[in-house]
Structures are given as C-alpha cells and as structure tokens.
C-alpha cells in the first residue's frame, strides 16, 4: 500500500510533511537513482511547475536531488502539466516532473511524475520509489554529477502541439473568448494560442503573484469568468485550473458546462465522424448517470474507472480508446496528448462551435444531468471508517433503496483525509436520505 503517493503524485501543504524541501531532495535523489539504475551514464529529466510561491523551493530541492544522482535537469519554468508529458517525450528524457497541486489553493503543492513515454507512473513504480525514498540512495561519483539548464521555449513548443491537434484551416476569427487561466501555469500560453488562432481574447486570471493561484478564479471557481462573459458579450468562456489540465466551459449566458458535458459533445462528434476508437468513452465512477444514458442512446459505450485521470489513461491504453476524462474537467485525447489537457479540450469545443456554426449554449448542454449529491466526511490519521460495521450496514441499506432508481458511490479521497459520499437519483427524498444516512454512519465511526 502506498503511503507517500496519492492518486496524483505526492501532495500536501508546503513546508509540512511530506511537502518539505528535505523530502523533495530525498524524492529527487530516489527518482534519479531509479531511472538511471540500468547504467551509470548521465541521464535527463525535465521539470515544470505552476506559479505557486513554493514552486521555487521545490524546483531547487528536486534539482539538487536529481543532479546528485547523475541526472541532467532541464528546467521548463511555469508550463501546463500536459506540456511536461509532451516535453518528456520530445526531449527524449528519462523522466518528467511537474510541481503543482493542480486546483488546490496556493499553500498546497505537489510533485507528480511522467515516465519516458510521457505517461504518468504506475502504482507499482510508485511503490518501488517509496521504498527508495525511505531507504535513501547513494549519490553519483563526483565526475558523474548532473547539470541543470533552463529551456526557454517550452511553452511555445507546447502551443504548437496544441494547435496541431486542430483542423489545419480552423480559425477563430470574430469569436470573442474569455480565457480564465486561474493565475496559473497557462497564464501566458493560453491567451497567446487563442490570439494566434484569431480569437478576440479577454484574459482573466493572468496575473500570478505566487499566492493567488486558483483564488476566486479558474475551473473550480468560474463565477468571475462567467460574469466577464456576460459583461463583455463574449461568445464563450474557457476556465482552466492552476496547472491547466482541467477545463470547464461557459456559454454566452454565463452557464457553466462541466467535463461530462464536454465529453458527451466530443464523444458524439467523434463517433459520428468515425474517429472514436473502440466505440466507447472512458470516464470515472464520478461521471453522471445522465452521461451514461446519453451515450447508450447513441450506441456509444462507457468504460468506468477509479477516480483520477491516470486511471482513465491506463484504461484508454489497455482498451485502445482515444477519448476519456473526468467530470471535474480532465479531458484526455490520446491521439494528441498523454494526459488531461484543459486548453486542448477547450479549443476542441471551440472547433465544434466553428464547424457547426452554433452558439456555445447550443453545444454545452448535451444531456440533462441526474441530480447528484456529494458530501465529504473528514477523518483522522489511522482511522478506517469504511471498515466499520455500522457504515457497511448503512451502505447496504442505501444501495437497496436506490436499486434501479439511482446509484451510490462511497470512496476514500486519494489527495485528502476525506470520505466522499455521492449518490444520484431523480427522487430528491431518496437522494438526500441515502447520502445523509451513510454520512451519519461514517461520522459516527470517526468519533
């Protein structure tokens, strides 16, 4: 069982375990040793980050650890997470590292890894890394210590890759687009790419100060962007999160469309064009029941996975699927990217607007979501509330009541000490009762 790694790398509050400079140094050394263990020649790693203040500290600590084991480090600076996957492959690196806590507040940070193929590491590799981190590793000989070098054009390389995923003749001339970059990693790249495609760009969340990432902006807080869309009479809004691997879309009325709606649009469009590999979409257990029904009506399959875009990608690779994602806005288009890419997904939504000549509001609501209720229960370290008898009894009773009229999902968060209790049903009484009963049982088990 992994102790250090969660569903998306190592994450926590900066300067608190495990996100300390000392731990980042140990992680860098362990990862460096792991990825050059076959021989003693010098290898290469790329490191990207978002705009958090603590990113400087972790960038330097990781660089020290990696170079101490003989890895040459290529520093990309602030770039979207998908750019790290791209650059790992294009720079022929042995490893890619992204320093980010994604949509979390500025005081948090995280470290996630990409293998030489540009894909996130498997659970098995992370277990091996944890053992090395705990045990410590021997440094390289003095003559084999690595070097560090800055790569100044990473965001431009990323921009060209994103644009290459679109039809060659697609232009956004005359389209007024609000782009909310969450004061994060895409604050320069996203507006530039939209401008290059011909859009009239209205930027929001493009003034990072190290402390304002995801604060009152971005995909998890799209209200300000929605107000901007309406106030400026914009055609559409695109909201990214801090590391730009998530997206939500805002139509011209200020209504927000989540990842499920975007996946529904792309899946139906790709299926109609014969581009949907495997005839199915890959999504997590959190995706709405309404999405499943929408796809079924169109003869499109739905493959569900655990929560986390890495598990979506794993299933896509196993089954030969090329479209997947999460309700939260991670959209993975594996013909073009190795991980969720919020900007790329947003641009493909714009491409559908242009191709069909339709408003955002005509495309952003593909299906009527089944009412969904989600509640979180915090627990303390060492507690295992889901194993308690009263919790298991409450779950069984709730599932019995929902049978055929909805669904219930209970899971432990992979990034926080939370138990997430979610249910879906058109019956509001049944919906609330199912969630409340399970939540009460979990809370009792944590006392």
Swiss-Prot record:
Keywords: Isomerase, Magnesium, Metal-binding, Phosphoprotein. Mg(2+) binds at residues 102, 241, 243, 245. InterPro entries: A-D-PHexomutase_a/b/a-I, A-D-PHexomutase_a/b/a-I/II/III, A-D-PHexomutase_a/b/a-II, A-D-PHexomutase_a/b/a-III, A-D-PHexomutase_C, A-D-PHexomutase_C_sf, A-D-PHexomutase_CS, Alpha-D-phosphohexomutase_SF. Gene3D superfamilies: Alpha-D-Glucose-1,6-Bisphosphate, subunit A, domain 3, Alpha-D-phosphohexomutase, C-terminal domain. Catalyzes the conversion of glucosamine-6-phosphate to glucosamine-1-phosphate. PANTHER family: PHOSPHOGLUCOMUTASE (ALPHA-D-GLUCOSE-1,6-BISPHOSPHATE-DEPENDENT) (PTHR42946:SF1), PHOSPHOHEXOSE MUTASE (PTHR42946). This is Phosphoglucosamine mutase. The gene is glmM.
């Amino acid at each position: 069982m992994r102790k250090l790694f969660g569903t998306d790398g190592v994450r926590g509050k900066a300067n608190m375990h495990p996100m300390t400079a000392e731990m980042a140094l140990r992680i860098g050394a362990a990862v460096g040793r792991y990825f050059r263990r076959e021989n003693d020649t010098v290898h290469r790693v790329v490191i990207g980050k978002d705009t958090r203040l603590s990113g400087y500290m972790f960038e330097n600590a990781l660089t020290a650890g990696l170079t101490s084991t003989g890895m040459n480090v290529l520093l990309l600076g602030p770039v979207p997470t998908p750019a790290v996957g791209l650059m790992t492959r294009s720079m022929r690196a042995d490893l890619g590292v992204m320093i980010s806590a994604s949509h979390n507040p500025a005081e948090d940070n995280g470290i996630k890894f990409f293998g030489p193929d540009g894909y996130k590491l498997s659970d098995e590799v992370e277990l091996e890394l944890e053992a090395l981190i705990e045990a410590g590793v021997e440094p390289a000989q003095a003559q084999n210590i690595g070097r560090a070098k800055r790569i100044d054009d990473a965001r431009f390389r990323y921009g060209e890759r994103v644009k290459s995923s679109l039809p060659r003749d697609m232009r956004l001339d005359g389209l007024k687009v609000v782009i909310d970059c969450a004061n994060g990693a895409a604050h320069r790249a996203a507006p530039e790419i939209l401008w290059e495609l011909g859009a009239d760009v209205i930027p929001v969340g493009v003034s990072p100060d190290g402390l304002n990432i995801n604060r009152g902006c971005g995909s998890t807080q799209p209200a300000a962007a929605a107000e901007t869309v309406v106030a400026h009479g914009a055609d559409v809004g695109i909201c990214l999160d801090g590391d730009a691997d998530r997206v939500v879309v805002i139509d011209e009325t200020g209504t927000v469309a989540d990842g499920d709606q975007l996946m529904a649009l792309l899946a139906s469009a790709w299926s109609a064009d014969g581009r949907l590999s495997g005839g199915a979409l890959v999504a997590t257990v959190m995706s709405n029941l309404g999405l499943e029904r929408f796809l079924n009506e169109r003869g499109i399959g739905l493959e569900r996975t655990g929560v986390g875009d890495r598990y979506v990608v794993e299933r896509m690779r196993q089954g030969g699927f090329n479209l997947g994602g999460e309700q939260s806005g991670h959209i993975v288009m594996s013909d073009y990217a190795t991980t969720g890419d919020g900007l790329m997904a947003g641009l493909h939504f714009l491409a559908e607007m242009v191709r069909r000549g339709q408003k955002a509001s005509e495309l952003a609501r593909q299906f009527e979501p089944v009412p969904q209720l989600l509640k979180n229960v915090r627990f303390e370290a060492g507690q295992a509330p889901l194993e308690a008898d009263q919790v298991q009894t409450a779950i069984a009773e709730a599932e019995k009541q929902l049978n055929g009229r909805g669904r219930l999902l209970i899971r432990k968060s992979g990034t926080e000490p939370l138990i997430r209790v979610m249910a879906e049903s058109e019956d509001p009484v049944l919906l609330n009762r199912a969630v409340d009963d399970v939540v009460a049982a979990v809370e009792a088990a944590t006392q």
